[in-house]
Amino acid sequence: MTDCRYFKLSPRDVAFRLELIHRVHGLEHAENYFNNISNKLKTFSAYGALLSGYVREKSVEKAEAIMQKMKEMDMAASSFPYNKMINLYSQTGEHDKIDMLMQEMERKGITQDEYTMLNRMAAYIAASDISGMERILNRIEEDRHFFVNWNVYSMVASGYLKVGMIEKALAMLKKMEGKMPLQGSKLAFEFLLTHYANTGHKEELYRV
């Protein structure tokens, strides 16, 4: 797979190369590679890899152009490109565009998976929109298809702490403890300790 003169490249190979070229040589080289491959190899995988690169670089205009192209070519029928754009808008603070994307997903019957929900929740937390955050939490808790792990309650606790809602944060931390693995998770434990420290309730910090 090292030389296209001797090995036939698959769409997955092209996507892998695009990701690698972007990481090693930069976005411009990745774009040149994409522009020079045959149309046959410009599949969902290739467009998805290029979109991921634009999101990584926070290049909104180019990401939106590729997203539009994917829609025109019927390559935006899954949650993947939408999740990428939600991630991008969350990073750039364009929360109104996230709402539009989620409405579009609902209108087109595209499943809003766990990644979609968590990205939307993160955007609400960044905007200190507590009602929005709670709305997403309720959807996740009520949908039997979602697995609510400790990280979800950790995110919600951080949202409450951000706006000074200590009692609600403490309630989420209790739920977080209930979702932590029995054998313990170093990462989860570190988050839990940090959150309890931020509540100012030292007795909870010492308890855990």
Regions found by a protein language model. Give the residues of each.
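Amphipathic alpha-helical segments of tetratricopeptide repeats
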Residues: 2-3, 72, 103-107, 138-142, ...
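Helix-turn-helix repeat elements of alpha-solenoid scaffolds
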Residues: 19-27, 56-62, 91-97, 122, ...
